[in-house]
Every structure is written in structure tokens, then in C-alpha cells.
Amino acid sequence: MIREQRSSRGGSRDQRTNRRIRAREVRVVGSDGSQLGVMPLEAALDRARTEGLDLVEISPMASPPVCKIMDYGKFKYEEKKKASEAKRAQVTVLLKEVKLRPKTEEHDYEFKVRNTRRFIEDGNKAKVVIQFRGREITHREQGTAILDDVAKDLKDVAVVEQMPRMEGRLMFMILAPTPKVAQKARELVRQAATAAKRPPPPGAPGAGKSAAGASSGAEEKAEETAEEKKEAQAAPAAAEAQSPTAS
């Protein structure tokens, strides 16, 4: 599996393999993880070639560089697979905007705080905005008081990531999940990703449905064929019994 690999003009960020390794001597780790010691590069390449594998430089800064005999294509595939699984397990953090007014009714306030709580419990952030209209802008303390109430009502699940500030006629703050809530959200995402990869258990709805259906269909077909044969054999005898005797 020794392959000649030429680097592009801009170089490559991949590990050096086979003939791209520049050192004259290398410390070699076998495909089974055993230490094979220091040897000339050509000897290491011959050993990898004998096993039908690649020689991969894993510690280029060591003296001499450390190389391992492995299937480099399989190694890259596994690395890509691990990166993909890690990416699926990551929590995508969203920023939800929650709009309130200086004179928000109590039921509207409670409704929006409940929704904000659920959103934060999912591992997301919330931008709580107070909209001022007309002369309401002269009473900014009302907006500050509402934002303080929101922060207090959600203190068990959220922390203030950005303190209240003005932007035009808007006052806003940003809430983020507490470390405990964020960790729980990440764990739920990981569990969901793991469950999605598992095949359904034998007794689960739909498991083995196609095989069972095929087997049942075959049995029914066999029964129908047997019945048809019996009817075909019985038909001549019945016809002879019913026919008049020749005179």
C-alpha cells in the first residue's frame, strides 16, 4: 500500500507519509503498537511495504521523528468519522429575541418569561429587549426594572452575559444558560445522537417487520398452492360420480 505522494505548491497540513517523510532515520511504532526502535527510513518503508501498510510520521518534532506503520486511508476515515460524530453532538446555540414594553401586562410578562426559560433550558441564549415609544424613553428606569425582574425570575437557569444597555430606543440584555443547564443540554444532545445510531430492539414496533411479513406471505402462498392441488385432484372424481351410467 506504499503510495508516492507529492505535496502541492502550498504544502499540506496532513501528516507526512511514506516517501514524503524527510528524515534519514526514524523511530518506528509497529501496526500493533509495539516499539520497533530507531532504523533508517528505507528500512522502515520496507517494513511497512511488507505488511501492505503505510509509514506515517506522527511526531515530526521528535528526534528522531516518530513514525507508525498503519493503514493511512483507514486512519483518515476514522478521524473524519469521529469529527462528524463530535459535530453532531455539539449544541447549536441560538439567540432568541424576547420583546417587552415598559408597561407590559403581567400575564404577557409571565408568558414570555416561561417561553424564555424553556429556550434557555435547551442550551440557548436570550436577548431580552425593552421597546420604548414616544416619551417612554424619558423613563428608562422602567425598562431597567423589567430587565432586573426577568434576570431574577430566571436566575436558577440563566446568568446575565451582557448587562442592560441602550441602543437607540431599545434597551436590552443577554441571558445565557448557567454552566449546569448548558452541561445538561449538551448531554441530552449526545444521548439523542447516540440513540439515533442504535438499531431498534427486536421487540420494538417495526423491527423485523419486513422479514416477518415476507415469511408470513410465503406461508400463505404455500397454503394456497396446497389447496389448489387438492381441488384439482378432487375435481375428476366428482365429475365421474355425477355423470349418468352409459346404457
From Swiss-Prot:
Name the source's superkingdom: Bacteria
* One Pfam family linked to the record: IF3_N
**Which portions of the sequence form the region Disordered?**
1-20, 188-247
Q: What Gene3D superfamilies does the record point to? A: Translation initiation factor 3 (IF-3), C-terminal domain, Translation initiation factor 3 (IF-3), N-terminal domain
Sorted alphabetically, the keyword list is: Cytoplasm, Initiation factor, Protein biosynthesis
**GO terms for biological process?**
ribosome disassembly
Q: Name one GO molecular function term.
A: translation initiation factor activity
Q: Which NCBIfam families match?
A: infC (TIGR00168)
The record describes the protein's role as: IF-3 binds to the 30S ribosomal subunit and shifts the equilibrium between 70S ribosomes and their 50S and 30S subunits in favor of the free subunits, thus enhancing the availability of 30S subunits on which protein synthesis initiation begins.
Note what the entry says on domains: The 66 residues C-terminal tail is not present in other species.
Give the record's family classification: Belongs to the IF-3 family.
Q: What is the name of this protein?
A: Translation initiation factor IF-3
Q: Write down the species.
A: Myxococcus xanthus
